[in-house]
Amino acid sequence: MKILHIDSGILGEHSVSRRLTAAIVSQIKADRPDADITYRDLASERVPHLTGAQIMAPADLEGVDPDLAADVRIGRQMLEEFLAAETVVVGAPMYNFSIPSQLKAWIDRLAVAGKTFRYSEAGAEGLAKGKKVIVASTRGGHYSVAPASAMDHQETYLRSVFGFFGITDIEFIRAEGLNLGADQKQFAIAEAEKTIAEGNVFKLAS
């Protein structure tokens, strides 16, 4: 089993999303010691955002500036890691009602026509079918119910973009209300970790 583990939280050891993705991957490893895990820390790697030059670069990169060529190769490697993975574990904190810009930059490297999606006369078709995506979703407030749910451009975006890639098996393990007091934070984390510890994650990833 190939696992791709992605962290995007910028708070380092204080990041709850990192804590949860580590627990998810640890649970999978305990049940599947043979799991082959690739890890990327998008906050420390500082994935460059897309540029016109990157998009227009020739496939063979002949004559391309060395820095631009390196940027293109990073994107290609990220795409190959994603395509090779059977299960993708993503740490996705909510920042200002959406996802971290680092995570968006990574997703932009995955959204490649002919690789993760294609267009035909019938419309768009996802090409990354058969994968499992597990998202550790963390939020300072409560956004899973109305009226605040209208401001959720985090989970809704991730479900949409992975769905666009053809992935229908998407699970969110959520810890929200983290900024609403110490008791609420402790409760939310404990509930998320309980879900992971019960082994539900491995069943989803198998």
UniProtKB/Swiss-Prot annotation:
Reactions the enzyme catalyzes: 2 a quinone + NADH + H(+) = 2 a 1,4-benzosemiquinone + NAD(+); N,N-dimethyl-1,4-phenylenediamine + anthranilate + 2 NAD(+) = 2-(4-dimethylaminophenyl)diazenylbenzoate + 2 NADH + 2 H(+)
Keyword annotations of the record: Flavoprotein, FMN, NAD, Oxidoreductase
Covalent S-S links between cysteines: none
InterPro entries documented for this protein: Flavodoxin_fold, Flavoprotein-like_sf, FMN-dep_NADH:Q_OxRdtase_AzoR1, NADH:quinone_OxRdtase_FMN_depd
Residues given in the record as FMN binding sites: 15-17, 94-97, 138-141
Cofactor: FMN
Complexes and interactors: Homodimer.
Protein's name in the database: FMN-dependent NADH:quinone oxidoreductase
Originating gene: azoR
